[in-house]
Amino acid sequence: MRTEYCGQLRLSHVGQQVTLCGWVNRRRDLGSLIFIDMRDREGIVQVFFDPDRADALKLASELRNEFCIQVTGTVRARDAKNVNADMATGEIEVLASSLTIINRADSLPLDANHVNTEEARLKYRYLDLRRPEMAQRLKTRAKITSLVRRFMDDHGFLDIETPMLTKATPEGARDYLVPSRVHKGKFYALPQSPQLFKQLLMMSGFDRYYQIVKCFRDEDLRADRQPEFTQIDVETSFMTALQVREVMEALVRHLWLEVKGVDLGDFPVMTFAEAERRYGSDKPDLRNPMELVDVADLLKSVEFAVFAGPANDPKGRVAALRVPGGAQLSRKQIDDYGNFVKIYGAKGLAYIKVNERAKGLDGINSPVAKFLTADIVDAILERTGAQDGDMIFFGADNKKVVADALGALRLKLGKDLSLTDEDKWAPLWVIDFPMFEDDGEGGLTAMHHPFTAPRDMTASELKTAPEEAVANAYDMVINGYEVGGGSVRIHNGEMQQTVFGILGINEQEQREKFGFLLDALKYGTPPHAGLAFGLDRLTMLLTGTDNIRDVIAFPKTTAAACLMTEAPSFANQAALTELGIQVVKKAENN
């Protein structure tokens, strides 16, 4: 039906007769001439109808936005004064000789000239996806997956599918369950990741595996989370953590070079402890120049319990955050930031305004100045590198609260005061995570997942001191987003059972949930390691949007619903009966 795409016409096509198919993006009726901007997935081209082709001109008068049409015409160069430098096709136009209206369009529920609500965009997603910026994002996503497949194929990885209907495993979120008609009362789980299957593939001898795969997690949603999402899933045998990181770093550098024309360079490596200490986060945004600086040793003797208490507590921390130019902040802004850190458990926000650095105590403004000596102020200013016009905020509490509160404040200030370099790319690896963390109920939970191996520990050493264990794990972070994470896996049955035991999974439960894995570990399991990237999040970064729904064709809302199809929906009673399921209605309060 067509010979060319609208958006691909150039000066090289001048004089050629072309047939185009697409939609009316805009129509301008000048009486004797009608101009339309005609759009397809590749872009927009100007088409005009003149009196010499009366039939086409008459039909063109009926055109309205989003009519689906076919146009045949001749490509012409525009006069110099009419060249549109803002359009890829701005040097040419098409003189139409014939027009076919394939399908007309009703009045549109979306307004192309205004910002539409996200609710409207998701309800009429098929119209929203016609917008050039949305089409471009999905084209970029397709390019990314194509680049990934070629790269992985070139590096000896095999694309192997794993099951969608599987068994529930503990991976940190609730499973989506699928009832079995054949096995009444039993349920499949949709996979949160192909974790165990890819490990089993390593045990089967497929030493380099990858898959671009759907995963499912029934968890509370955020702007960068979806109940169904796509992973670039990778696993290898006989490779060290460093070797895995090198290959995966090469993949990501390849993506940025091909999609953005940017060489990310070598990725710096930072331990979890250093990231938390310096940035208050295990996924630090290195585009932001501010860092947390420990000052507890300077404040142990002050007569101010807010500082002295945490400064003298082994589990406490007092840290400072220097904000370049922050002395300009108003009292209201400071109060607003004080309320902001309370979200993260902080009780408030002490501060020092640095007016004249050289004057020390006499050159600052601070509600806590009366508790500080000149020597202490000089030491704080020296350690933080404060300059005239800076602000120093303090966090004083237990280590987690200080890291969370000042880490979040650092990001907010970086954005509010334009301190974060938005034109920069800042990738890094974060390694050496704690293997376990407190579950809040007196037990331990795996920081990554229960199949991650510890670094340099035997099973007996791990059992004796699990709190000291460091996971052989690694996360890739870009501009403050965790885009991928992985680890060296446990390939020894004794170690795996030890980890299960530490997590409170007894032997009977181990056999019920992971018997197949424990059996497989008995038969010459190779050392193996892997990683998974979030394709949606990578695409979000590479297309410059901060909303993951912008890079998924048909996403869910933050309530895990599809406004277009109205999923989820109630099942009919016959289907429920066949599955042996009875819906229990919630009792209404009178």
From Swiss-Prot:
GO biological process, one term: aspartyl-tRNA aminoacylation
Catalysed reactions, semicolon-separated: tRNA(Asp) + L-aspartate + ATP = L-aspartyl-tRNA(Asp) + AMP + diphosphate
Pfam families: GAD, tRNA-synt_2, tRNA_anti-codon
Binding site for ATP: 217-219, 226, 482, 534-537
Superkingdom of origin organism: Bacteria
Gene Ontology MF terms in the entry: aspartate-tRNA ligase activity; ATP binding; nucleic acid binding
Record-stated family: Belongs to the class-II aminoacyl-tRNA synthetase family. Type 1 subfamily.
Subunit structure: Homodimer.
Alphabetical list of NCBIfam families matching this protein: aspS_bact, PRK00476.1
Function statement: Catalyzes the attachment of L-aspartate to tRNA(Asp) in a two-step reaction: L-aspartate is first activated by ATP to form Asp-AMP and then transferred to the acceptor end of tRNA(Asp).
Protein name, as recorded: Aspartate--tRNA ligase
Chain's gene name: aspS
